[in-house]
Structure formats: structure tokens, C-alpha cells
């Protein structure tokens, strides 16, 4: 049976994201494991076919051991397995690959339109997205484009209406979004996770 690890960054706080993400995995007939990373629980290496790193209330510059460990683990997982990161998880993924992560002038909490880039329109996860697709954001930090084109081939897939990065692909296996695709909204945002899981679990 294919397997999905959900790396939960909510620190035990009530949320609807983990249940929604688990439902996506189960819909794809995957064995789902949920790991409280803030509490120090992590997936066993090479045990899972793909990973989703959730959002959460923490800060991407937190000096706590869990933040350091998650940020270091993401590129290790992505060396061989697909990883999708959301919200805070996306900020940690971006930082792990050397992209600037900054606190914006105002927090973003609500539904906002995004703008896909040409790379986004051709990316297998984002190709359903249109200009002004509504997405849910709940954040006080943002990811900025790197000052120079990354040699790794990393690309911005979409920009938020605030002008920072809404989604990016850092490597073949490492991709994520500042918005929450697990939130059910009108538009194509929820297809991002469905496409990620179909691609990650196909043939496993």
C-alpha cells in the first residue's frame, strides 16, 4: 500500500488541516501517518512514499529544536521522495533552499487571488490554476524570490496579490505553497494536492 507522512506543525493546537490532508491521502488509498514534529515525533527515514509538511502557528525563525530539525529534514526527504509544504512548512522549505523569508508589513489572513507564472502554468501540480484563483492565506511571514536566478533550476510557480511568492518548485521533489490548498474554495486550488498525491503515489 502506498504511504503518506503528514508532518504536523500545529504543536497540538486544534486545526482542520490534518484531517483534510488525511482525507486526501485516504482518497488515494494511501496509508497515512501523522507526526507531531513540534512535539519531537518524525517519520522514520525511507519509510514513506511522500511527505506533506503542514502549516502552523510557529515562526520560521524560531530557534526551537523542532524548527531546526524540520528545516534540515525537508531537503533530505526530497532527495528521493516527493515533498509538498504548506504555509509555515513552505517557509521552512524555502529557507532550507536559501530563499529569503521575511515578515511582511501586514499579516495576511483570508482569501486572496494569486497569479500563476508561465512556469506555474506548465507545472504538473499547478496547471489547473488561473489568474485570480482564490486561495486561503493565514500568515505573518512571506517568501521572496531569490535575488539571482537559482542555479538549481528552482522556479516561482505563482505570486500572491501582495507580490511575494505564493508557490514554488525548488527541486524535482520539493514543492510547496504559502496558501492552504487543503481549504475547499471555489476555483482550482484544491487540485494542487490531488495532483501531488496522484503523481507521488502512482506506481507505488
Where are these regions (language model features)?
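Cysteine-nucleophile active-site neighborhood
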Residues: 54-120
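Flexible, glycine-rich phosphate/dinucleotide-binding loops
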Residues: 13, 41, 60, 92, ...
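Pocket-forming structural segment of enzyme catalytic cores
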Residues: 97-170, 174-187
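Generic recognition of short, well-ordered alpha-helical segments
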Residues: 16-19, 46, 65, 88, ...
Amino acid at each position: 500500500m502506498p504511504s503518506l507522512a503528514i508532518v504536523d506543525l500545529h504543536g497540538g493546537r486544534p486545526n482542520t488541516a490534518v484531517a483534510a490532508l488525511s482525507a486526501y491521502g485516504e482518497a488515494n488509498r494511501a496509508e497515512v501517518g501523522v507526526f507531531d514534529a513540534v512535539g519531537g515525533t518524525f517519520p522514520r527515514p525511507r519509510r514513506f512514499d511522500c511527505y506533506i509538511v503542514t502549516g502552523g502557528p510557529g515562526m520560521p525563525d524560531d530557534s526551537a529544536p523542532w524548527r531546526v530539525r524540520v528545516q534540515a529534514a525537508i531537503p533530505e526527504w526530497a532527495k528521493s521522495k516527493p515533498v509538498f509544504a504548506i504555509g509555515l512548512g513552505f517557509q521552512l522549505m524555502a529557507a532550507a533552499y536559501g530563499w529569503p523569508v521575511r515578515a511582511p508589513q501586514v499579516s495576511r489572513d483570508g482569501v486572496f487571488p494569486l497569479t500563476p507564472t508561465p512556469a506555474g502554468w506548465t507545472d504538473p501540480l499547478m496547471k489547473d490554476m488561473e489568474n485570480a484563483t482564490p486561495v486561503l492565506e493565514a500568515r505573518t511571514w512571506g517568501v521572496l524570490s531569490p535575488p539571482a536566478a537559482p542555479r538549481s533550476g528552482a522556479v516561482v510557480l505563482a505570486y500572491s496579490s501582495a507580490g511575494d511568492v505564493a508557490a514554488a518548485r525548488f527541486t524535482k521533489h520539493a514543492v510547496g505553497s504559502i496558501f492552504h490548498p487543503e481549504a475547499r474554495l471555489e476555483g482550482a486550488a484544491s487540485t494542487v494536492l490531488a495532483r501531488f498525491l496522484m503523481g507521488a503515489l502512482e506506481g507505488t
